[in-house]
Amino acid sequence: MWNQKPCFRFEIDNFSEKKDVIASKAFVSGGCEWFLYLYPKGQSLNDDHMSLYLSVANSKSLGSGWKRSAKFYFSVLNESDKELYRSTISQEFCLFCVQALAWGIRKALPLSKFEEKGFLEKDKLIVEVYIKNFEAVDGEGGGVSKKEEEETVEIIGSQDYASQVTLVRKIFAEHPEIAEEFKPKNQVFKKEYMNILRNAYRKVSELAEVKMDWVKSKIEEVSLEIKKRNDEVSEVPLDNKIADDDDDDYDEWEQDIEERLKNLEGMEFDSKLDSLKSKLDEISLERKKSYDADGSRVQQLEERVKDIELILKSKLEEVSSEKKKKADADGSLEDRVKNLELMVSDLKVEVDNEKAKSSADGFLLVEEVA
């Protein structure tokens, strides 16, 4: 008779996003440790079915010659516990050993089923496993249990509850010297010894967890302190921020003014720029002094810069005006020169005419004498 309650229930969220093999945590059934694993996209590239397997857990902690004999089946459900698939139960027992750590179904559910609309609810898949009638041999020095769903299992001569077998195996695996020296014949003494051993192991584990929790808390405190300091550095006080902004903006304004001064100097009007240079020096000295805490300093600097801009503008207009006057003066001089050139040209013409006339009169006179 199969138990109506599954031995283990494996819930997988975001199943459609899974590609690689998925393994469950270890669980105990009948005093033995097991775990499930499945291939959501098939065991190989050519497979078009999901694969399901039941495997022995922590096999390295078992003695040589260990084995498990069991029947089992899988039930695959959706989020609302609707059964989507149930595997068949084999007639023969499956023998789990070193050569065969796992048994299962290579072709369980077709992958095409998962593409059907509404097949999976909220992208969640649930796998339940039912295990029955097993024989467990823990290898050299281990005991044998043949009862169906036994409540206890014998480990190195000591009867332990199935729920505690994981802890006992863990102790013997991590400390094999205890298992080698543990050979009492008195059953009462065995039980008390195992209880003391389990309690001591739990106590040490709890202390280790407390220490780890303390270390984690300290790490979190340091992280919070670092984050707090970073926030304090990033959140600069308003006074300092205004001063820094003034400094940066004023550097740009000063650079711009200096470039304009250089352009004016290129026009060879040095005498008219002396006052501007002195004012620029005053501004540079004022910038090096400590700024007031309130924002009025920013407004004062902006007004000061505006005044400088106006002075520059007026000086540029003066320069442009003088340049224009000079150009006009040069133009009038050119006109006078042109007029003089015309007068000279006219005089030359008159002289040439007079010379020509004199030459003509002389020629006629010689002709008459002859």
Curated annotation (Swiss-Prot):
The segment(s) forming the MATH domain are: 5-131
Q: Do you know which CDD domains this protein is assigned to?
A: MATH
Alphabetic keyword roster: Coiled coil
Coiled-coil regions, chain positions = 204-358
Output this protein's name.
Answer: MATH domain and coiled-coil domain-containing protein At2g42480
Q: Which organism is it from?
A: Arabidopsis thaliana
